[in-house]
Amino acid sequence: MIDFPIKYRLIKKEKYTGARLGEIITPHGTFPTPMFMPVGTQATVKTQSPEELKQMGSGIILANTYHLWLRPGDELIAKAGGLHKFMNWDQAILTDSGGFQVYSLAEKRDISEEGVTFKNHLNGSKMFLSPEKAISVQNNLGSDIMMSFDECPQFYQPYDYVKKSIERTSRWAERGLKAHRRPHDQGLFGIVQGAGFEDLRRQSSHDLVSMDFPGYSIGGLAVGETHEEMNAVLDFTVPLLPENKPRYLMGVGAPDSLIDGVIRGVDMYDCVLPTRIARNGTCMTSNGRLVVKNAAYAEDFSPIDPECDCYTCKNYTRAYVRHLLKADETFGIRLTSYHNLYFLVNLMAKVRQAIVDDNLLEFRQDFIEKYGYNASNRNF
């Protein structure tokens, strides 16, 4: 039996749902699950220091392979001693494969069996990313958890296209496993695709589970489908994945989606949402989203969220944060970003406690009622 560098330990199953409390052991420490992972695209979580991320309880962060491969280059990071030393982060790091960025950012991409040829979005130069190259770059980065190179088809692509795509993704996953130079200290996850088609998700899961990865990601969601469609895919996909390994739902950060994923047995999430909306002055609060830049808060001397105990809410008022944002002061973005990240990391801590107490469905109902979801704001 392979001794994987990434191990999942189940602590408790929730009585009334598929939710599970656990922990993931990595070469750079252990973190509890379910967990939300802040995204550090360019080897930094925008405006936040490693110390601040630790304060808020982030045991793992994500970095983007595509961006770091293009700039400053994976070989330079390897010379620095790997990503942990380069960015002074001594806890777990997960890297994606670069595939999603190739499909979403790059121009004029051409997908073949060998890989993807595309134009560098920074300078227009021609680039080629293959399963082997994606693994090689991540081996140089030295992340604790790596992703297989996959194609992320759009959710509403035709069935025949998605079928060919998942079959190619399975072949790419096998090639990536063979190219992996550091299986002793980097865990490589397989990525299940298949859009909204149950039989294709089943086929993709079967292919990848047979390859015995140390963990599995669910890709191809949060790409334009409805909340109900996402939940339906999770309902038939999560049970196909091994119970003794981590389950990671990629690119999901809306609070209700996090809770609904946990109910269905998901352990890990990542998303740029909390920092992206923070830069526009939008804050997640216990009572729903709050656009602190609005004129209504010019003389509001209460915290962004009176129920939040983060650094921002304990020390600064809505009026002050609004002033900073209106004056284009970076500190304002730091404060809103810290708050939003803390909100999601802390939400997962509350979810973990609800699993312990066997009252996750009640917790969900209370949260949704208070947050006030409706069609206009459900993405926040």
Swiss-Prot record:
<comment type="pathway">
    <text>tRNA modification; tRNA-queuosine biosynthesis.</text>
</comment>
<feature type="binding site">
    <location>
        <position position="308"/>
    </location>
    <ligand>
        <name>Zn(2+)</name>
    </ligand>
</feature>
<dbReference type="GO" id="GO:0046872">
    <property type="term" value="F:metal ion binding"/>
</dbReference>
<feature type="binding site">
    <location>
        <position position="310"/>
    </location>
    <ligand>
        <name>Zn(2+)</name>
    </ligand>
</feature>
<keyword id="KW-0328">Glycosyltransferase</keyword>
<dbReference type="GO" id="GO:0101030">
    <property type="term" value="P:tRNA-guanine transglycosylation"/>
</dbReference>
<dbReference type="InterPro" id="IPR002616">
    <property type="entry name" value="tRNA_ribo_trans-like"/>
</dbReference>
<dbReference type="GO" id="GO:0008479">
    <property type="term" value="F:tRNA-guanosine(34) queuine transglycosylase activity"/>
</dbReference>
<feature type="binding site">
    <location>
        <position position="313"/>
    </location>
    <ligand>
        <name>Zn(2+)</name>
    </ligand>
</feature>
<feature type="active site" description="Proton acceptor">
    <location>
        <position position="96"/>
    </location>
</feature>
<dbReference type="Pfam" id="PF01702">
    <property type="entry name" value="TGT"/>
</dbReference>
<keyword id="KW-0479">Metal-binding</keyword>
<feature type="binding site">
    <location>
        <position position="339"/>
    </location>
    <ligand>
        <name>Zn(2+)</name>
    </ligand>
</feature>
<feature type="binding site">
    <location>
        <position position="150"/>
    </location>
    <ligand>
        <name>substrate</name>
    </ligand>
</feature>
<comment type="subunit">
    <text>Homodimer. Within each dimer, one monomer is responsible for RNA recognition and catalysis, while the other monomer binds to the replacement base PreQ1.</text>
</comment>
<comment type="function">
    <text>Catalyzes the base-exchange of a guanine (G) residue with the queuine precursor 7-aminomethyl-7-deazaguanine (PreQ1) at position 34 (anticodon wobble position) in tRNAs with GU(N) anticodons (tRNA-Asp, -Asn, -His and -Tyr). Catalysis occurs through a double-displacement mechanism. The nucleophile active site attacks the C1' of nucleotide 34 to detach the guanine base from the RNA, forming a covalent enzyme-RNA intermediate. The proton acceptor active site deprotonates the incoming PreQ1, allowing a nucleophilic attack on the C1' of the ribose to form the product.</text>
</comment>
<comment type="similarity">
    <text>Belongs to the queuine tRNA-ribosyltransferase family.</text>
</comment>
<keyword id="KW-0862">Zinc</keyword>
<feature type="binding site">
    <location>
        <position position="220"/>
    </location>
    <ligand>
        <name>substrate</name>
    </ligand>
</feature>
<keyword id="KW-0808">Transferase</keyword>
<feature type="region of interest" description="RNA binding; important for wobble base 34 recognition">
    <location>
        <begin position="275"/>
        <end position="279"/>
    </location>
</feature>
<feature type="region of interest" description="RNA binding">
    <location>
        <begin position="251"/>
        <end position="257"/>
    </location>
</feature>
<keyword id="KW-0819">tRNA processing</keyword>
<dbReference type="GO" id="GO:0008616">
    <property type="term" value="P:queuosine biosynthetic process"/>
</dbReference>
<feature type="binding site">
    <location>
        <position position="193"/>
    </location>
    <ligand>
        <name>substrate</name>
    </ligand>
</feature>
<dbReference type="GO" id="GO:0005829">
    <property type="term" value="C:cytosol"/>
</dbReference>
<dbReference type="InterPro" id="IPR050076">
    <property type="entry name" value="ArchSynthase1/Queuine_TRR"/>
</dbReference>
<dbReference type="GO" id="GO:0002099">
    <property type="term" value="P:tRNA wobble guanine modification"/>
</dbReference>
<protein>
    <recommendedName>
        <fullName>Queuine tRNA-ribosyltransferase</fullName>
        <ecNumber>2.4.2.29</ecNumber>
    </recommendedName>
</protein>
<keyword id="KW-0671">Queuosine biosynthesis</keyword>
<feature type="binding site">
    <location>
        <begin position="96"/>
        <end position="100"/>
    </location>
    <ligand>
        <name>substrate</name>
    </ligand>
</feature>
<dbReference type="InterPro" id="IPR004803">
    <property type="entry name" value="TGT"/>
</dbReference>
<feature type="active site" description="Nucleophile">
    <location>
        <position position="270"/>
    </location>
</feature>
<dbReference type="InterPro" id="IPR036511">
    <property type="entry name" value="TGT-like_sf"/>
</dbReference>
